[in-house]
Amino acid sequence: RDLVRSRGLGDVYKRQLLLTHNMKNTDYNWTAGIYGINVDSNGEVTLSVLIRSEVTITGKPKNGKGNDVVFKFKIKKWFTSLGATSSNTWDIINTSCSYGQMPSSLELAQRPSGGVVPRKVGTLWGEYGNLKTYGNAFSSTDYWTSTQLMGVHEKFNPETGISELGTGKSSGLCVEYY
């Protein structure tokens, strides 16, 4: 068993349960037993509310044979877009993260290698990929980060995962830690 996506995204959190040893999510009936959590037949977990405690997901074999499969996880970071309409200077966006803070570019994605940003657990873009595919929450072309080089803050591209030095206005992104 393995888990991906330890970060919340926008107003809804999704997490895909991964099984090993030729096991299939569709062979199990999934339950969480907590309000605000839904697990579909493909093993995708959706949290419609932020749950700060550890979450346990249980899969019972549909054929009644074999052991239950149990997944446990806890949200460590919750990322929220201030929306594409929040386009403003870095200083104004930074003060808009009153319930958290602006993330660093390395929390959002690793640096590209050969022009490609790696997809792997540990960063928001690494776990979710193109954030623009998740609806209007990440529809802006770029977002300010807390990362600063030579006195200039970086902007993060939610489509490519690449951060570059930026000026002018951009949208806001905040992160809360748990």
Regions found by a protein language model. Give the residues of each.
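Strand-loop-strand motifs at the edges of beta-sheets in extracellular beta-sandwich domains
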Residues: G33-L50, G161
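Single conserved hydrophobic/aromatic residue that forms the stacking wall/gate
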Residues: D2-Y13
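Short, polar loop/linker segments at the starts of domains and inter-domain junctions
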Residues: T85-T95, V152-L165
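Short, structured beta-strand segments at or near domain termini in extracellular proteins/domains
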Residues: I57-G59, G64, V69-K77, W144, ...
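Conserved hydrophobic ligand-interaction patch in extracellular adhesion modules
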Residues: K76-Q148
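Extracellular/periplasmic catalytic domains that process cell-envelope and extracellular macromolecules
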Residues: I51, G66-D68, S96-C97, G135-S139, ...
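Exposed beta-strand face motif in extracellular beta-rich ectodomains
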Residues: I51-I57
